[in-house]
């Protein structure tokens, strides 16, 4: 591999994330807190940075957005009962909910019809997999 090829791989052009920044309006702040609360309930407060890193690696959130999300998460207090009781892994449905939060933070509204269609499509794929693979 020559130097030009190697440098082009290393200096690959930046592909924008689905969520580059967190909007500054109060509506977005509410959505951020609700999203972080959702994640904390699923994986525990201390595991939220790992989830955000996973979303970064998927190209869903930028490093700039993660920095702001982490600032928000520092302001979230948990009841003693909630601390580290939910340290499970996120399900596919949990990731889809996160993706919907990301879309809303980008100002995109997802209609209930689109959600119903998505849910129907997921059920159809699952049913096909069950029939094909005998799951």
Swiss-Prot record:
Keywords from the UniProt entry:
Archaeal flagellum
Known Pfam families for this protein?
Arch_fla_DE
One GO cellular component from the entry? archaeal-type flagellum
Query: Which is a GO BP term held by this UniProt record?
Result: archaeal or bacterial-type flagellum-dependent cell motility
InterPro entries in the record, alphabetically?
Arch_fla_DE (IPR006752), Flagella_assembly_related (IPR052494)
Q: List the disulfide bonds.
A: none
Q: According to its UniProt record, where is this protein located?
A: Archaeal flagellum
Family that this chain belongs to: To M.jannaschii FlaE, also to FlaD.
- Its name, as the record gives it, is Putative flagella-related protein E
Q: Which gene encodes it?
A: flaE
